[in-house]
């Protein structure tokens, strides 16, 4: 909105400047010019102000416009990558894997996957412009302790046209169930754990220093359904004027 308004005023200023030059150097009598040009200028400014008032669609509004299609993909488990596929992608040099951990900082400090970036869920939208500049072979993998937080982040990024965004199926808890069973320093919490809460205790906050942060793919034979489908690179979403 502000960009449109600025462009309109810049254009009007240039037209006004051109008229003044013609008046000074060309002897043009502006008082004899049609008054309709003022009406036209006013209409342009009015239109720009309307655009400014309407503003840019919010992330929630953008999501609503695609919710039917994307919710179906979530329900069909098309965007939740299983641990076996993620482990394969980690070692696929044709792809650039960007791991985005949206859990609380305390959980991230206890344990996180190797090279995972800590991005608080309420700050995920600030990252959109940077993510859209990544190469076309980039895969973005969101993770939370289960899937709730990662799903919210996925909706936000998908609504803003960030391509190739996926969710770690089962979250960090499922990852630890698969790869941390031989590490006595990591123990499963007995009983029920609240949704999207860490279901394990750790001897120390070692972050990615635990071996299960980057498992050796040759030590595991995990069956998985291939769900990764690279999208063609798309430009940043405008979401409206402004």
Regions found by a protein language model. Name each.
Residues 1, 122-178:
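Catalytic cysteine-centered active loop of the rhodanese-like fold, especially the PTP/DSP P-loop
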Residues 163-206:
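A contiguous, mid-protein "functional segment" used to position or interact
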Residues 81-88, 102, 115-129:
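A short, well-structured beta->alpha microelement
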Residues 93-99, 114-115, 138-140, 163-164:
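Short active-site oxyanion
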Residues 2-98, 102-110, 188-242:
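Flexible, polar/low-complexity N-terminal or interdomain linker segments that lie immediately upstream
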Residues 107-120, 133-139:
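Mid-length scaffold segments of soluble, non-membrane domains
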Residues 70-74, 114-117, 139-145:
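Second-shell loop/turn segments in exported
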